[in-house]
């Protein structure tokens, strides 16, 4: 036998051994999965599902609970009779395929069986949970019924023990208690006949109604007290106040009808009681709030009339005296105006105003007569009378204020005249002082614009003296002249100061610059121009500027230094 044949035989044997090992391994894996399926099937089949269902059957469920139970029971019957058999068949088929070395088909069959058993396990778990919920619901109903009944019994006892606190509402409370009791009876019937789910819903409703009724009963006594005691007492007090109001001969405004308002309050009280019997607590609270507002509104009307009466009695008694006082003031003011106009011209129409006040006083006097007549006759509400009295008093106060203002103006005329006279005399004295001050400077002459300013200011002051010397003085004209003269004097003083300062400084700077005149032609020419401006043109400002620029050419800062020394040592002029 050749070596090639031997090699082929060895290779073939190796392949056969490898295939056999692979077949054994695949068969073993599939067999393990089949065994696992068998164990899961047995575990699922051993669950006490049937026992749990049988125990629920003994509960004899009806209604909604029975419908739910039938669905779970039918699902279990389908699983136990059909699904388990089908699963057995698939597992058996997988075993046959595995034993005959149809590995791939066997694996597919095992996978299908695994998917099927997973669904079955989920279905069984759902069935058990659904059945357990029915049992648990029954237990909850059994536990909760006593708690709910205790709530109901306590509520019924509280209502019975405190029936006097609920007034006429007790009948409605008893109706609600009867309805709740009917709901509990319905629950017992449903629960005992095997419908725990529907019974639980009825029990929940009964408990909610019990809690709601408890909340209502806690609020009712307060409302009963308010409706049956507090509000009637307030209405009684209000009626007494109204009777007293009428007895004291008060008159109400036309838009206030006490009887209608009292009837309206009683209607709201009846409505509150009716709403309380219907357990409309929010509306009851709103009605009571409205009653409170209306009661307070009536008291406010009474208080307004009482307050108005006090005001009328206090002020009306002095109205005539006040008018006579203002009338006397007016008469005296007219006399004062006639006296003042002998010496002064009045431009404020003071006399016209005072005559207008006199006419207004006559009108107010007529109003006061009418007001006093209404007070005596008691035919008008005090609130209206009070407004009319206040209107008259305010008008009289305004007239008096204006009278005082005019009187102060007349009295101040003499003071204004005296002040203007003093100012005129002071300005006249200052003008003479300025004239002497300028003359002492020994200037070659004065600029025309300065002379014009000086003489114009003098004319202003003389005009002021002229106006002050008239037989009848116009104080407005005098005050205007005082203002204009004051401004002119201010400008003249500034112009005088600038003129004399620049004249003196120009002379000093020219003298200082002479030391450079012989050696510097520009300085000599600058001095010549400065002297020309000073002596011939009488332009002292120009002369000062010219010599200052000239000195800067040969000695920078000299002009500023000399000016600084001058202003530091310069005495204050007498006119300042």
UniProtKB/Swiss-Prot annotation:
Coiled-coil annotated spans: 105-134, 277-301
Protein name per UniProt: Septation ring formation regulator EzrA
NCBIfam families: PRK04778.1-4
Topological domains annotated Cytoplasmic: 27-576
Keyword Cell membrane applies: yes
Protein family membership: Belongs to the EzrA family.
Name of the gene: ezrA
Sequence intervals crossing the membrane: 8-26
Organism of provenance: Lactococcus lactis subsp. lactis (strain IL1403)
Location, primary (coarse class): membrane
């Amino acid at each position: 036998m050749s070596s090639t044949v031997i090699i082929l035989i060895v290779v073939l044997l190796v392949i056969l051994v490898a295939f056999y090992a692979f077949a054994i391994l695949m068969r073993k894996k599939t067999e393990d999965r089949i065994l696992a399926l068998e164990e899961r099937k047995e575990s699922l089949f051993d669950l006490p599902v049937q026992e749990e269902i049988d125990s629920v059957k003994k509960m004899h469920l009806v209604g909604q609970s029975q419908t739910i139970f039938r669905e779970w029971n039918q699902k279990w019957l389908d699983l136990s009779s059909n699904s388990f058999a089908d699963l057995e068949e698939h597992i058996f088929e997988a075993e046959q395929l595995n034993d005959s070395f149809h590995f791939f088909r066997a694996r597919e069959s095992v996978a299908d069986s695994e998917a099927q058993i997973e669904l079955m396990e989920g279905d069984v778990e759902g069935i058990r949970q659904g059945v357990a919920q029915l049992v648990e619901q029954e237990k909850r109903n059994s536990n909760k019924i006593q708690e709910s009944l205790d709530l109901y019994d306590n509520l019924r006892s509280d209502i019975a023990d405190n029936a006097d606190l609920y007034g006429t509402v007790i009948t409605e409370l008893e109706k609600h208690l009867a309805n709740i009791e009917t709901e509990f009876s319905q629950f017992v019937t449903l629960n005992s006949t095997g419908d725990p789910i529907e019974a639980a819903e009825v029990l929940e409703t009964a408990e909610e109604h019990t809690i709601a009724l408890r909340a209502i009963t806690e609020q009712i006594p307060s409302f009963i007290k308010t409706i049956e005691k507090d509000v009637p007492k307030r209405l009684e007090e209000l009626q007494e106040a109204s009777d007293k109001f009428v007895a004291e001969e008060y008159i109400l405004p036309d838009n206030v009808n006490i009887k209608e308002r009292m009837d309206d309050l009683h209607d709201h009280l009846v409505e509150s009681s009716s709403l309380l019997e219907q357990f409309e607590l929010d509306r009851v609270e709103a009605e009571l709030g409205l009653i409170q507002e209306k009661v307070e509104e009536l008291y406010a009307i009474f208080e307004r009339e009482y307050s108005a009466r006090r005001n009328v009695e206090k002020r009306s008694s002095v109205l005539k005296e006040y008018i006579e006082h203002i009338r006397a003031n007016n008469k005296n003011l007219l006399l004062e105006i006639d006296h003042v106009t002998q010496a002064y011209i009045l431009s404020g129409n003071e006399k016209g105003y005072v005559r207008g006040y006199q006419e207004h006083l006559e009108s107010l006097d007529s109003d006061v007569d009418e007001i006093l007549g209404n007070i005596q006759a008691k035919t008008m509400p005090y609130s209206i009378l009070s407004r009319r009295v206040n209107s008259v008093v305010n008008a009289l106060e305004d007239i008096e204020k204006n009278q005082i203002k005019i009187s102060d103006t007349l009295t101040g005329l003499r003071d204004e005249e005296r002040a203007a006279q003093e100012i005129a005399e002071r300005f006249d004295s200052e003008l003479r002082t300025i004239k002497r001050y300028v003359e002492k400077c020994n200037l070659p002459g004065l600029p025309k614009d300065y002379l014009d300013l000086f003489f114009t200011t003098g004319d202003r002051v003389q005009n002021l003296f002229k106006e002050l010397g008239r037989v009848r003085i116009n104080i407005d004209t005098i005050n205007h002249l005082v203002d204009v003269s004051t401004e002119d004097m201010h400008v003249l003083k500034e112009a005088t100061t600038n003129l004399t300062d620049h004249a003196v400084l120009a002379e000093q700077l020219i003298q200082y610059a002479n030391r450079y005149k012989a050696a510097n032609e520009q300085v000599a020419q600058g001095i010549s121009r400065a002297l020309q401006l000073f002596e011939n043109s009488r332009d002292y400002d120009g002369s000062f500027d010219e010599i200052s620029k000239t000195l800067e050419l040969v000695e920078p800062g000299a002009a500023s230094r000399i000016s600084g020394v001058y202003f530091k040592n310069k005495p204050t002029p007498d006119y300042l």
